[in-house]
Amino acid sequence: MSVSRANFIKGTAATIVASSILFSGIGSATAAEVHQTLPGVSVAGVVPNAQSATSAFTDVAHDPFKAEIGWMKDKGLANGWAQPDGTAKFNPEWDVQRAAQVAFLYRLSGSPEVELPEHSPFIDVDESNPFYKEIIWAFQNDIVTGWQYDDGSRAFKPWQPVERNATAAWFYRLAGSPEFQAPVTPSFRDVHPSHPFYKEIEWMKANKITTGWPDGTFRPNAHTHRNAVAAFVYRYNVAVLGYGS
């Protein structure tokens, strides 16, 4: 069956404040507990705090985003995984998976009421999925469409890691899909104007939400890691919501 990659994700406007994904620690975060900060809770005046991260988590002392991770800890948005010795780990380089990312967006939107359908729109997501409600919400609000096959069925692939290009698209749409003229000359040598998420990635770059790698790449198909999510969330608050400066 062929898959329509261009139909991977769509977006919707949302008014949000920062939050983070807290996983329960099963495998590579295949089951997740997503904590929330509801709309109206100000994060103004909170700046990144590397000391908070290193004192809270034993595995981020040398992480380039330890300050942003500390900011999330200060806001009560990231508790990590408790260890038998009483310490905690953040697991900064773990992949963020699609189901968890959708749950993250749902909580950011205030955990709205969801009218569940009689049948799931996805062949691989049913009521046994811990994020069934969140995934249905995302589909109903045109945030995700999943992969559509030739026979008309759809798959969501909930435990597949989120790619960086999809993360860019989600943040762009969370900002309300603002008017933005992407540059003719690409900012990243591996993201060309023909890329389906070129505008969204360039918007992230223009708003300093992403910087890419020192070698001039964005690596759009690489998996999004937890430390990168911390950085993106913090920068989104500064650039789009005007908080955290």
Residues of each region from the PLM?
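Short amphipathic alpha-helical surface patches that serve as generic macromolecular interface elements
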Residues: Y198-I201, R226
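Short, hydrophobic-biased amphipathic alpha-helical segments
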Residues: H225, V229-F232
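Phosphate/pyrophosphate-binding loop motifs in nucleotide- or prenyl diphosphate-using proteins
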Residues: G76, D142, K208
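A short amphipathic alpha-helical interaction element
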Residues: I69-M72, L105, A138, F171, ...
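Sec-dependent signal peptide hydrophobic core
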Residues: I9-V17
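Feature responds to low-complexity, polar/acidic, surface-exposed segments characteristic
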Residues: S2-K10, L22-P64, N79-V102, R107-E134, ...
